[in-house]
């Protein structure tokens, strides 16, 4: 590759000989900063906490002009260095083999142009070779021009046929569009395997109503290359390698059928956020949140209004959770806001920790704002606005100024699968203090009062799985050590409210299942006992059931008829 004529994604493969494969890696110094486009992988300078810096390989996900400074931002100091012209364009990078939480916007001056750069792999040509289209004998007369574009009538037939095929849930007979939402729920619940199909907006709306994501959720787990959400394929994502419908020359005369590229773009810009994990939601739109006295860096995309996108800091009232673009507006709001605790019933108070029960139907605005905040830290959360079917249990810590939110978990009012947690989160400024375990323990205390076995909504994310495994292990091992007689799996489940599947999962993960005298037994190894002793030796908070003042809420059929 000649330094005088750098390769660009548009110019690759357009050499003197047609069909010549373009190099996938550009050597250092053979390209310029203008050649860095979304999709390439390049080395980026990453500052470290110790004051040093290292070069990390990163993928460019998006670019944008450098945002203008906010009118509320403080002026730069007089001795500040002059801005680098390369920083006029910012690049959103994902560090390869690092967690998605570390994705960030960087200026052009942090790109290492002296090292090699990898071009994005071409996807169109290999797929055309791997999936040749079946030739169909055409009954229409051939045209003199020899153009491959079919007539409008044939195009309409082909487009409508492709759209009907895309709406089928199984290879059998076609399913009406009104039943697609129901079929998607059955497929996700595991009743029968579901084939790939293109999702319509009706599907995504039905999926949003039934999917409140776990804090821990994996999909998901759900893990992509860095432990986060991947594209939905078996659940109904659009496979761009299959059935492409060409657009006619006269769009006005065409039926309301889109090509794959148009459909993906439509979903990306106006469709349900459930389908856009790999598009818009890959790019974080907020940098920091100011919640009370804590300034927190966001981890993931959250669908706040576009007017607030890419602000340096979004200011949030820690009591009513309303959001403002400047500290001045927040101060004006705080002078009028009278809320000092979550707007619900306090059902637990002990040692400064309180739990409030909030009905999503009665406090829609507050719960929606809570979901928007939690989406900044939960990559797999897909439900933001339909909060009516859920109860929210918010944990707070009390001081002289009020009850400050620490974390929460949501719970379906009526769960067919028996889940006792739909989404769970401890705010980052309060993590690693044992509050996550308190949330998990409190959810099981509610299940004990209900007299039911409970389990978090599956699948769990990496952090959620670690937290639940630690809780399950502690409770199961503690019960086995305190028992002076043989105890069955059913007795463990009834005393802890942990489901049989979660008990078996924990025992298998700890290698506690042994085969002895023609039966399976639970055997506590020395390593498990030693780890349990170390855990119990640490001082930690615990839920005291005597301070729980709560009865399971009962809802009428009319109260559970959400959206009808």
Swiss-Prot record:
| Primary residence | nucleus
Q: Pfam families this protein is in?
A: MOZ_SAS, Tudor-knot, zf-MYST
Question: What PROSITE patterns does the record tag this protein with?
Answer: MYST_HAT
| Residue positions of motif ESA1-RPD3 motif | 364-385
What EC number is given for this enzyme? 2.3.1.48, 2.3.1.-
| Reactions this protein catalyses | L-lysyl-[histone] + acetyl-CoA = N(6)-acetyl-L-lysyl-[histone] + CoA + H(+); L-lysyl-[protein] + acetyl-CoA = N(6)-acetyl-L-lysyl-[protein] + CoA + H(+); 2-hydroxyisobutanoyl-CoA + L-lysyl-[protein] = N(6)-(2-hydroxyisobutanoyl)-L-lysyl-[protein] + CoA + H(+); (2E)-butenoyl-CoA + L-lysyl-[protein] = N(6)-(2E)-butenoyl-L-lysyl-[protein] + CoA + H(+)
Which residue ranges have biased composition labelled Basic and acidic residues?
113-128
Which residue numbers delimit the Tudor-knot domain? 36-112
GO MF annotation terms: chromatin binding; histone acetyltransferase activity; histone H3K4 acetyltransferase activity; peptide 2-hydroxyisobutyryltransferase activity; peptide butyryltransferase activity; peptide crotonyltransferase activity; transcription coregulator activity; zinc ion binding
- Stretches of Pro residues bias are at 72-83
Residues annotated as binding acetyl-CoA: 422-426, 431-437, 461
Task: Please indicate if the UniProt record lists Transmembrane helix as a keyword.
Answer: no
Q: Show the active-site residues.
A: 457
**Where does the UniProt annotation place the signal sequence?**
none
The record's annotation in Gene3D superfamilies points to: 2.30.30.140, 3.40.630.30, N-acetyl transferase-like, Winged helix-like DNA-binding domain superfamily/Winged helix DNA-binding domain
- Transcription regulation as a keyword of this entry, yes or no, is yes
GO cellular component terms, alphabetically, are: chromatin; NuA4 histone acetyltransferase complex; nucleus; pericentric heterochromatin; site of double-strand break; Swr1 complex
What subcellular compartments does it reside in?
Answer: Nucleus; Chromosome
Function of the protein: Catalytic component of the NuA4 histone acetyltransferase (HAT) complex which is involved in epigenetic transcriptional activation of selected genes principally by acetylation of nucleosomal histones H4, H3, H2B, H2A and H2A variant H2A.Z. Acetylates histone H4 to form H4K5ac, H4K8ac, H4K12ac and H4K16ac, histone H3 to form H3K14ac, and histone H2A to form H2AK4ac and H2AK7ac. The NuA4 complex is involved in the DNA damage response and is required for chromosome segregation. The NuA4 complex plays a direct role in repair of DNA double-strand breaks (DSBs) through homologous recombination.
Comment block on domains = The ESA1-RPD3 motif is common to ESA1 and RPD3 and is required for ESA1 histone acetyl-transferase (HAT) activity and RPD3 histone deacetylase (HDAC) activity.
The entry assigns this protein to a family as follows: Belongs to the MYST (SAS/MOZ) family.
Which named protein is this?
Answer: Histone acetyltransferase ESA1
- The coding gene here is ESA1
